[in-house]
Amino acid sequence: MFCVIYRSARREQTYLYVEKKDDFSRVPEELLAGFGQPIMTMMLPLDGRKKLANADLEKVKQALKDQGYYLQLPPPPENLLKQHLESIGKK
């Protein structure tokens, strides 16, 4: 199984995985409108892989099979104040 990964022109660290190059037929129009112009980043074989950098491999495969796409959102921002308060509260 191969996938093609596109990055969003509008949102940093947001990626869209699809099964075939330039085939967005199964991606909802609303999602594409918010995503902006997809910029192809890479083609990737999923078979034989053990993991992906920032996405769960099994979730990606299942989403591609079930809905035809997988949307990778950026990680939540670090809350350094919360981390600091928790660290001094534990001491």
From Swiss-Prot:
> SUPFAM superfamilies from the entry?
YcgL-like
User: Residues in domain YcgL?
Assistant: 1-85
Do you know which InterPro entries this protein is assigned to?
Answer: YcgL-like_sf, YcgL_dom
Superkingdom in the source lineage? Bacteria
- Signal peptide position in this chain? none
Q: Which PANTHER family match?
A: PROTEIN YCGL
Q: Which HAMAP family match?
A: UPF0745
Protein name as catalogued: YcgL domain-containing protein ESA_01460
| Annotated source species | Cronobacter sakazakii (strain ATCC BAA-894)
